[in-house]
């Protein structure tokens, strides 16, 4: 369960980073 949360947070941060680069 903890690993799942960590994966989710990593994915969210990755998506936010991509958005920051695009915009």
Curated annotation (Swiss-Prot):
Name of the protein described by the UniProt record: Protein NS0
One Pfam family from the record: Circovir2_Orf1
InterPro entries linked to this entry: Circovirus2_Orf1
Role this protein plays: May play a role inhost modulation. Is not involved in viral protein synthesis or DNA replication.
Lineage, top ranks: Viruses, Monodnaviria, Shotokuvirae, Cressdnaviricota, Arfiviricetes
